[in-house]
Amino acid sequence: MDRSKDARKRSISLACTVCRKRKLKCDGNKPCGRCIRLNTPKECIYNIDKRKDKRKIKNGSKVFLFKNNTIDNGNNSILENKGLNEDLSSHIYEKEAPKFDSDIDISRFGTNDAVIFNNDGWDTSLPIDFDFDEFNTETTDFDDFLKLLGDNSPSKEQKSLSYSPTATGLSGVVKETESEDNAPTRSRLIDVLFENKLHSVPGISKWHLYELESQYPNLECTEGNSDEKFLLSTVLCLGSLTIRKRELLNHSNIDNRPLLPENSISKLTTDAFKYYNAAKTLVPDLLSHPTIDGFCGLVLMANFMTMMISLEHQLYLSINALQLAVALNLNNNTKCKELLESNSDGIGVILLFWNIWCSSCMLATIHGKNPFITLEQITTPLPCEISPRNKTNKLLIDFMQIRIKLATLQSKIFQRLYTSSTANEVPFVNLEREFEEVSLQITRLKGFPIFEEHLFYRSRVLMLELSCLRAQASFLLYRPYLITGESLQAVTMAKSIIHEIWSQYTKQFPDNEKERHERLDWNFCYPLRTASLTLCISCIILLRYKQVVQFLKGTELFEYILALEILQDLVQVLPIEQNLIDIIKYPISPVQLSGDSFVEFWGRILY
């Protein structure tokens, strides 16, 4: 028997198909308010609800209970449903996106805040032409070089007596710690990059560097190939910086006596400065004549320049390295196969490409910029496809595979949630699913059994790196919901990663500092930069959280204090990271900024 029209009306679905698909609240009108705002009134359709409805009487009123929903039959009050006995932990595994309040204008917030940026004139494009003369050390100021290295800089009164910097190096040095006989030879500086077989510089042959070292006794001469001299200069600079940083850290851990005699400068420091300037003058030649040596050298330069230039300049330097890679067709599968056949170091060159690509994706997205090149534009063989797998390098290959997935995910998140102007599709659920899958892979990799000492300590660095990159992806994913107050997942992740970084770097456990000093190698800048960046963004998120929660405004969050503690310690290794501490302690309005896209992008959370 047919039901009455009233019964049919009661059985209509509570939400239209548009709101139901988006998993958002619906006011039940036809068309509903949300479809009117989205200019899709024709798509506002209500399906028949085939679920069994149960009539209940409470407080003299008849109400219908549709499973988990409690709807008043005459007024707008929501009745408490005490008949549900569901497992609270089941909510953890729900795949739904955080629901927006129907009062929020989805055209402004929605699931992407590209509209927010566009209204404020935010530019997500990358100016890929980078002027190398804009480096912090463009004036070849040796005082600045000493400070960025964390070396003991002579006073200005001693400056005229102790050294006289020139455009290409130093002259007139009065005193140096090492004599010419006792100072590390150039071959020793090369060896530093290859002393750990588990973590030597990929793509570069030590024997090739020995040949260049004997071929170019004077790097300032105009004869020879620019790319070869550039590669040798960057290797020698990085070797000098690594040994000198070890000396500085080990000395500071022993006593407070002066490391150098008065008016003296370490020859390692002066050599590093000399090699840096020699490499810098050759960069324009690299960009106009791309070669494998030039590409490898520029990737190394991007490594040690981490401690000398701003984050934005680091981004553009990595883009220049990628430009060389694209010019060499390192993003092309066919050309890479030819490289593997013709070059014995081809595998390492491809690994260098993936490393600099991952780094550039991370730097681009945290600056609110589109990546220079996406994975869809790359057919380069993955590390797992070209590297021989054994027990020793399985961990390293798996690390690279997950790192590439995280870089890809960060790029997807930024493009779909921040750049795309499409408002008809909600990609958040798929992105969140990808994020959870990568997180699971990281968790499994952390359980990889390791019983060799060197591999164990190496894995600690790699796993923390993955945790930091995962946290950064999470911050990008949940940032719009933090702004609208619809989810605190970013806050949860911020607290978690701060604890993880603190446990590995805090000086409250002496073994942490001992491990960092004893195992400091040529790549010491990258992991510390990643940790510092993650701590900085975490603190900004916690500051936003305090703004939202009124009763927390006058208190200091425990994790915030831990993060500042670690940042203060890391500044002792990378003094340039003091900029990140200043961003946290002295936040300024984005309208007062002078083009620092990192501060502008994350500072918008606080205003």
From Swiss-Prot:
InterPro entries referenced in this protein's UniProt entry, alphabetically: Fungal_SecMet_Regulators, Transcription_factor_dom_fun, Zn2-C6_fun-type_DNA-bd_sf, Zn2Cys6_DnaBD
GO molecular function terms attached to this record: DNA-binding transcription factor activity, RNA polymerase II-specific; RNA polymerase II cis-regulatory region sequence-specific DNA binding; sequence-specific DNA binding; zinc ion binding
Zinc listed as a keyword: yes
GO annotations of cellular component type: nucleus
Record keyword Metal-binding present: yes
Domain of life: Eukaryota
Cell compartments where the protein resides: Nucleus
Keywords assigned: DNA-binding, Metal-binding, Nucleus, Transcription, Transcription regulation, Zinc
One of the GO BP terms on file: DNA-templated transcription
Pfam families per UniProt: Fungal_trans, Zn_clus
DNA-binding region range list: 16-44
SMART domains: GAL4
Matches recorded under PANTHER family: REGULATORY PROTEIN GAL4 (PTHR47424:SF3)
Protein name per UniProt: Uncharacterized transcriptional regulatory protein YNR063W
Species of the source: Saccharomyces cerevisiae (strain ATCC 204508 / S288c)
